[in-house]
């Protein structure tokens, strides 16, 4: 699961779509409470990959003539990330309800196919981008992308898929929207992980030594795979559009529907 999380969290192909298939193929000997928490907390490893790769762009302080200086451009970026995160905070109380009612094959497959088709529509109608650098992103852009990010509360949507579609519609370049999407993940995924742990503990659950080890290994593996996935995507979007990912999502959605049909029959 660490491998799947590390790769699919950053590519716009839905980590949930892959997780739901993986859980069908591999029967995990763990409680549903632990698996629900594990699926989210494992993202901490993925977040660390973003921090490591983009540390120079994310750290708002530097040195000049032996003095610590503040970087206004980095502070501005962080304020925009915070602005984009506010819509997610508002709808976050719905997260558990959405998971309980829509974490199923049909919903996941529908979202995979829908956003796969959206990638084709957006790329085919796309004009030349007018935002190619992070500092050109306005607060309006950030908030709208944040609203698109809210759609990821529906299983199978893909957080990165939703924000990338939103960013492309706003006129951001592929590389710019991909990088901004990585940064948006830091507060959202860190907050979601913390919330899941708190709910797990408050609910009276206690991790066994084996579960702690499994979670730690999952985070480490997710970190390593995320490093590779992020580097791949940033290099890929410099030369290609997102149609490949759209096609992949549609095919995966059909596979999920097929698995759902077989599961219902047998």
Describe the predicted segments one by one.
Residues 1-266:
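Multi-pass membrane proteins that catalyze or facilitate reactions on polyprenyl-/lipid-phosphate substrates
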